[in-house]
Amino acid sequence: MIDTTVFQDKTAVYYTLGCKLNFSETSTIGKILREAGVRTARKGEKADLCIVNTCSVTEMADKKCRQAIHRLVKQHPGAVVVVTGCYAQLKPGDVAKIEGVDVVLGAEQKKDLLQYLGDLHKHEGGEAYTTATKDIRSFAPSCSRGDRTRFFLKVQDGCDYFCSYCTIPFARGRSRNGTIASLVEQARQAAAEGGKEIVLTGVNIGDFGKSTGETFFDLVKALDRVEGIERYRISSIEPNLLTDEIIEYVSRSRSFMPHFHIPLQSGSDEVLQLMRRRYGTELFASKIAKIKEVMPDAFIGVDVIVGTRGETAGYFEKAYEFIHGLDVTQLHVFSYSERPGTQALKIDHVVTPEEKHQRSQRLLALSDEKTKAFYARHIGQTMPVLMEKPKAGALMHGFTANYIRVEVESDAALDNKVVNVLLGDFNEEGTALKGTITQ
């Protein structure tokens, strides 16, 4: 039994870097601490406990993690500092040496943080607790809301793909998942708490079922039957795991939205092979075509990495032309970052930082062009929009089913409500459409 009396009336701050999955897991950590008697520190209040959930997808992510730790140590003198997440799993010794860090928890340990916090006293030096990647077995459930309107439901963790540029399998372990029954129950609980929208999160969610003998399609169908949840979004799914069966089901689903996020990474078959991706451009293009065939107005986001080792100028031009021809909505562009221990380091051709920047800027410009064209096609239409809680100012925003961001005049009564909105022209920044509520 853990003695939780030491946690009573203590305060905590939380800092999360990286993906939606990390935000979901931080929320679960916060829930564990709340149940032990810890409250979230108010703005400007010195905290007794600092939780940092880290990312390690790039070298820049590592740097941001270190900066965040230093900043929190300075802002909250005397606080017990706990660092977890991918950077903590990959470099526990380095993190433990950072001045002010008390406890470092790996992927397997973060769900049990109370037992590692002990008496909640500062340590002489950081203590690291991790498990070898090959021995990471547990699946820690997480369904978070926090200060976000939508819920994030963790359905899967880990990855078995071992792409040549990526350290995530080493940080997260092998693919594993919750049971459909447990995930449906979490969705029902979210609905009971007033949730209208759930985003399915994971590392490789299309690989769902490895540890339970179920399939992602089975999960989609089961969640679609949960009463009270009006919208589901699939956060990201590998193209080779996005079956025509899933696409067709979403097109006629009650609650799964016409919104997909699909990692391409490169539009060059040669580079995809160097990356050890499990598809080629022909398969990727066929998935986009299938989506648009049955859902012409679907929003499709695509991940692209520029400047990977082996990406010659010719291969990039080939990739650019392929992406230019795809009927997609938005590009999420990342510059390749060298990661220790990856197979990509054995590839000879190295792209200069200047070339990476130029390629990134070209793709970002293309993305902007595609997104604005997609938004413009919907001007003048009336569409249901799920409104999100207003922030400071005269405007609040929400999203259509196909993920168009819409701004309307602020009205707190509209928070978490689905209302019909007439879509007008772009806002001044060009980041949303101005809307008028019609009901």
Can you annotate each of these PLM segments?
Residues 1-207, 221, 245, 260, ...:
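Proteins enriched for Cys/Gly/acidic motifs involved in redox and nucleic-acid/cofactor modification
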Residues 311, 326-328:
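Contiguous mid-protein beta-loop-alpha structural module that forms a pocket-lining wall or clamp
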